[in-house]
């Protein structure tokens, strides 16, 4: 331990000059003070070669890490720029999507109205087609059969106005033997036999004649005597013979309601309707090919080995010279 009295004497000696400074601190008192205050591990400590090599390798690692960080920073700069561009593009796309959604909400009522109009148009076309084939009569068409028979028995002649209805009494009078019936009654019975009895099936799909069906199709076709007019006649005749004229007309109107034109509807039906699959086209005899309608002359082709309607062959023209040409659509 330090002696406090001794240290006090030394301090007093130094302050009064009785004790020289060199005697206490040596020749260079600041050298010991410098050495005492000098931090450890700078010059006083010598590093071994092993530690020096480790320090050098650590510096290299730190330098490599700095280079890697700088490289990564250089790479991240364009990536950040691209991400910002993508973000701005996404914002624009989101804005446009919201705008489209708003427009769709505005268009929805118009689309519903379009579907309603399409359904109304389809229903009206079917009603018009059926209306053309309903029996239209005037006069006493609502008179009951009893009133008709009473008038006939009283006056001996039927009512002056036409009365077309299904009356068993008139039919029996017209067909019974030994009964003299007036010509008017006979005509009424003939008309009644020709009237199509309306039912749920016959009203929805009336069995039209080939001529009436072709005339209906002609109203949708532009021009005259085109290959599609010939196709309409051929398809109408085949549909009538197969008893599917009503179904064919309904399918035709269905395709028209989808937005197709009459030519496309006839072409599709000729290749998909079951009554036309595998059917051989009819042979039409002509004097020469100059008598073929002019719009059809450019569509004449050589007759293939097995022509069918579902493959686009409408008919085959045969001239008096024995030559044949097929009409192709």
Swiss-Prot record:
Q: Which GO terms describe its cellular component?
A: host cell cytoplasm; virion component
Q: Which UniProt keywords apply?
A: Coiled coil, Host cytoplasm, Transcription, Viral RNA replication, Virion
Entry's InterPro entries?
Filo_VP35, VP35_IID, VP35_IID_b-sht, VP35_IID_hlx
- Domain VP35 IID: from-to ranges: 204-329
As for subcellular location, the record says: Virion; Host cytoplasm
Q: Which residues form a coiled coil?
A: 70-120
Q: How does it assemble?
A: Homooligomer. Homomultimerization via the coiled coil domain is a prerequisite for binding to L. Found in a trimeric complex in which VP35 bridges L and the nucleoprotein. Interacts with NP. Disrupts innate immune signaling in infected host cell.
Provide the function of this protein. Answer: Plays an essential role in viral RNA synthesis and also a role in suppressing innate immune signaling.
Protein name according to UniProt: Polymerase cofactor VP35
> Which species is the source of this protein?
Lake Victoria marburgvirus (strain Popp-67)
- Tell me the lineage of the source organism: Viruses, Riboviria, Orthornavirae, Negarnaviricota, Haploviricotina
